[in-house]
């Protein structure tokens, strides 16, 4: 998914210097990493990529629900766009079938929502002359 997402971001014209990749040990750590990136950088959009595969315990539901809730809470609290591309699947086969499409979709969503943020920031007067290089 990451490779598909990165390829699509580049195809959409996102410059390498505007892409940061951070890895974390598991899906539950993704919201924290997103928050740290948000706090340390001026970002228009972010992508959360991961995969949770159902096992034999309730852990699947917990990890799926809590990682999604953490991302949704951050979107609401910080007014930042996050394309949530954390797959929740029954098995590895399902994941393999979905990775290319979902990685590409996540990049498309991130760019579309990032562009929306830039437009609305300009309309609301949040845009500074330093940010013109990002367009």
Please give the residue ranges for each predicted region.
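Glycine-rich phosphate/diphosphate-binding loop of Rossmann-like nucleotide-binding domains
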Residues: 1-25
């Amino acid at each position: 998914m990451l490779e598909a997402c990165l390829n699509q971001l580049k195809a959409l014209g996102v410059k390498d210097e505007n892409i940061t990749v951070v890895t974390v040990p598991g899906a539950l750590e993704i919201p924290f990493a997103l928050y740290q990136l948000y706090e340390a950088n001026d970002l228009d959009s972010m992508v959360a990529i991961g995969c949770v595969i159902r096992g034999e315990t309730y852990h699947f539901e917990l990890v799926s629900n809590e990682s999604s809730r953490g991302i949704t809470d951050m979107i609401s609290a910080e007014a930042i766009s996050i394309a949530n591309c954390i797959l929740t699947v029954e098995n590895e086969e399902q994941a393999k079938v979905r990775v290319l499409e979902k990685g590409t979709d996540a990049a498309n969503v991130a760019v579309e929502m990032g562009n929306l943020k830039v437009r609305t920031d300009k309309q609301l007067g949040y845009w500074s002359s330093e940010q013109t290089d990002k367009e």
